[in-house]
Design a protein with these regions (language model features):
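Eukaryotic nuclear low-complexity, Arg/Ser/Gly/Pro-rich intrinsically disordered regions
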Residues: 1-49
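Intrinsic-disorder/low-complexity coil detector
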Residues: 22-23, 27, 34, 98, ...
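Generic preference for flexible, low-structure residues
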Residues: 25-28, 47, 72-74, 108-111, ...
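Interaction modules related to DNA damage response and DNA replication/repair
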Residues: 44-124
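Ser/Thr/Gly-rich flexible loops in soluble cytosolic domains mediating phosphotransfer, phosphorylation
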Residues: 116-143
Length: 143
């Protein structure tokens, strides 16, 4: 974990100082606008790189009738830079699935060659601040 923290802190340090090196923009009024060198913004940018390019659907993770975008794992995936969807489509790269029999989403993901992973994959990716190896988080699908 210390190695992860060091890697993230070095990236944030580099991002803050890169922003400080950028000259301020000028508004039409002539006022200068300084670049955003706030470490919180740099942290958000670094976090959003973790799953950038991933398009994720969820199967048996979000309770039926609940708004998917309010589920903690959906929100975590978005904070990590993934695009979340309620259905498996042509661009789906991952389906995060709870254990159980295969659902239509799981079958569609497998047919399209998308990874079917457990919720632990998202949590591990968040902890490590990098995309976890999908091979270690294969969803426990019966049959």
């Amino acid at each position: 974990m210390l190695a992860v923290a060091l890697r993230v802190l070095l990236a944030v340090h580099g991002g803050v100082f890169a922003a400080l090196a950028v000259p301020p923009r000028r508004l039409p009024s002539g006022d200068a606008v300084a670049p955003n060198w706030d470490a919180r913004a740099v942290l958000g940018t670094e976090r959003a790189r973790v799953l950038a390019g991933c398009r994720i659907a969820f199967s048996r993770v979000v309770p039926l009738g609940a708004p998917p975008a309010e589920h903690p794992l959906w929100r975590l995936a978005e904070r990590l830079g993934a695009a979340c969807a309620t259905a498996v489509g042509a661009g789906t790269t991952h389906v995060v699935a709870a254990p159980g029999p295969p659902t239509d989403k799981v079958l569609a993901a497998r047919a399209a060659g998308a990874a079917v992973v457990s919720p632990g994959w998202l949590q591990c990716s968040a902890t490590l601040w990098r995309r976890a190896d999908e091979a270690h988080f294969s969803a426990q699908i019966e049959g």
